[in-house]
Amino acid sequence: MDGVKEWFNSIPPVSRYMFAIFLGIPVLAAMHLISFNYLYLDFTFTFKHFHLWRLITAPCIISSLGPMFLFNLIFFYQYTTRLESLNYAGKSDDYLFCIIFISICNIIFGLIFEYYFLGTMTIMSLIYIYSRMNPTGTSNFYGFFSFKTIYLPWVFLVAHFLQTGHPPYSDFLAIVSGHIFFYLTDIYPRANGVPALIKTPKFITNIFNKGDRNPNNVRRDPRTGRPIQEGGYNWGQGHALG
């Protein structure tokens, strides 16, 4: 039991609580302590009956317990911990903002196209961001073959199509959500030499103890570790999985 506690506490903070929520919801549902009926995304319940908690729970629901849930949970654990411990090392506030931003985008898509459970979209968005932040790395799929990490989300896209036989529209929209975030925080600023177009709100930064994060408040390129000149602004940053 001590080993499990030690392992759980070793997970970076945002990933730790997200993992607990992703796992806890279907476990509690299987024990009949909660019902998915009160957690999925629905416009009428959310905005007309003010079930605003659905905006938080829907992006964290993969499915009920089962083999596919387990596979998706493993993928989530792999890529969220890599992102937060590598690309967002010491910047858990920026990582939390990244998750909030992509969740908002996925919620908008979910409301438009009537997707009720958005957990797999959250995972796909993070996988896309990871692939863009670590494009030259090497990834493998189920241990069968290796490829450049930049292709990772597209490999998942094809795999989901082969598994289900249905066009993976929600996966593609999740990639769009991830790309919007990466474009605003990396592609456009890097191409034009300007600060990121969105930044982590102060209230999110205040959640975390920032005393030892960065004494000089210098933002660094996750690929090189070198300081990034930001024209006097302290912008939050979003990055991808590998």
From Swiss-Prot:
Question: What keywords is this UniProt entry annotated with?
Answer: Endoplasmic reticulum, Membrane, Transmembrane, Transmembrane helix, Unfolded protein response
Q: Which GO terms describe its molecular function?
A: signal recognition particle binding
**Topological domain, Cytoplasmic: which ranges?**
1-18, 120-140, 189-242
Report residue spans for region: Disordered.
214-242
User: One GO CC term of this entry?
Assistant: endoplasmic reticulum membrane
Q: What is its main location?
A: endoplasmic reticulum
Please name the InterPro entries in this protein's record. DER1 (IPR007599), Rhomboid-like_sf (IPR035952)
An example GO BP is: endoplasmic reticulum unfolded protein response
Q: Topology versus the membrane, per the UniProt entry?
A: Multi-pass membrane protein
Ranges of Basic and acidic residues compositional bias? 214-224
Keyword Membrane among UniProt keywords: yes
Localization (cell)? Endoplasmic reticulum membrane
Give any Pfam family that matches.
DER1
Q: Could you tell me which residue ranges are on the Lumenal side of the membrane?
A: 40-98, 162-167
Q: Where is the composition biased (Gly residues)?
A: 233-242
Q: Which residues cross the membrane?
A: 19-39, 99-119, 141-161, 168-188
Please give the function described in this protein's UniProt entry: May be involved in the degradation process of specific misfolded endoplasmic reticulum (ER) luminal proteins. May also involved in endoplasmic reticulum stress-induced pre-emptive quality control, a mechanism that selectively attenuates the translocation of newly synthesized proteins into the endoplasmic reticulum and reroutes them to the cytosol for proteasomal degradation.
The record's PANTHER family line, in alphabetical order, gives:
DER1-LIKE PROTEIN, DERLIN
**Similarity-based family:** Belongs to the derlin family.
Q: What is this protein called?
A: Probable derlin-1 homolog
Task: Record the organism.
Answer: Dictyostelium discoideum (Social amoeba)
Q: Which gene encodes it?
A: derl1
